[in-house]
Amino acid sequence: MEGQEFYGEYLGKTDPLGADVPNPVSHIAYGYATQVCILNEEGKIEQIVAAHDVGKAVNPLSIEGQIEGGVVMSMGYALTERYPLDNCKPTAKYGTLGLLRANQIPEITPIIVEKQGLNVACGAIGIGEITSIPTARAIADAYFRYDGRLRTSLPLENTPYTRK
């Protein structure tokens, strides 16, 4: 994708507070994100670059932390975590879920994409759940480029992170 440019635009329309209309639209906000996973020669994750459109970045440091936390959480979903159930009851203990340890976390490069003048609360469109949505797909795509094997279930199998 290097050297390519992508463009998209969305404007959420809401009704003013106190508007006398049936079923008023009080808020609407959409976030957009993209992530890229870079593997090293051994197939371990070296870096994840995560670009997120947040509208107005009210607290950039907090946004970076939210992006990093969402990436780490989703890395666990993608690579190591299992939550087995037996008749709808969890069978794993916390220590056996496969949560990533701090020394397993790669470099995460958060990129905050701002668009000024949005007609939403303070111009901010949020940075919650979306931080963990693109990660697993980005990791699966990186492994596909790495070894040509399509992986379609989580946690991804046949990676250096796969539990024996």
Where are these regions (language model features)?
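C-terminal catalytic domains of large/alpha subunits in multi-subunit enzymes
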Residues: 1-164
